[in-house]
Swiss-Prot record:
This is Large ribosomal subunit protein bL17. Pfam families: Ribosomal_L17. It comes from the Bacteria. GO terms for molecular function: structural constituent of ribosome. Residues 132-202 are annotated as: Disordered. Part of the 50S ribosomal subunit. Contacts protein L32. GO terms for cellular component: cytosolic large ribosomal subunit. Residues 134-168 have a biased composition (Low complexity). GO terms for biological process: translation. PANTHER family: LARGE RIBOSOMAL SUBUNIT PROTEIN BL17M (PTHR14413:SF16), RIBOSOMAL PROTEIN L17 (PTHR14413). Residues 169-193 have a biased composition (Acidic residues). It comes from Mycolicibacterium vanbaalenii (strain DSM 7251 / JCM 13017 / BCRC 16820 / KCTC 9966 / NRRL B-24157 / PYR-1) (Mycobacterium vanbaalenii). Belongs to the bacterial ribosomal protein bL17 family. Gene3D superfamilies: Ribosomal protein L17 (3.90.1030.10).
Amino acid sequence: MPKPTKGPRLGGSSSHQKALLANLATSLFEHGRIKTTEPKARALRPYAEKLITHAKKGTLHNRREVMKKIRDKDVVHVLFAEIGPFFADRSGGYTRIIKVENRKGDNAPMAVIELVREKTVTSEANRARRADAAQKAASAGAQEVTAAAAPQAAVEPEAVETEASAETAEAEVETAEVEAVDEASAEEADEATEVEKADDDK
């Protein structure tokens, strides 16, 4: 169940506060910036940004929701045709509040609330800094991968050479064994031949 915000209302009643915020939002969308008291500016900011979010979606339902609060059709047209598309790539923070000198007479704290129309130098610098940091991180990661792969590549030829030398040694041993067997069989054949000759002589 929705409940009213705690604390005093602007204007003294709920209906007066709704009308006050609607009129302030209409003036803000029409002129781009307005000067009002600081409490009114802080109350207007979320109210106006929700209307801008409706304008970004741009459907008929959103237009009818905005028309419930902003009764000036020309201002609604500007909101949906210009302001909404301008903030299409921005996910929030469509307005800014700047404190100014207190009002003469009653010394009320004053502020200027305006639409953020320009791209600030700070945001551009932050974006460039983040891009540079991402590139440096990517290059550092690539260097680490290359450095890790180099020792493995150096170890692999050594392992191949070791395996080749082991295979060569095994082949030499097998060859020596075969030669020894051949020599033994040749000696046995010679001995058998000599025995046969001796028998023939007898």
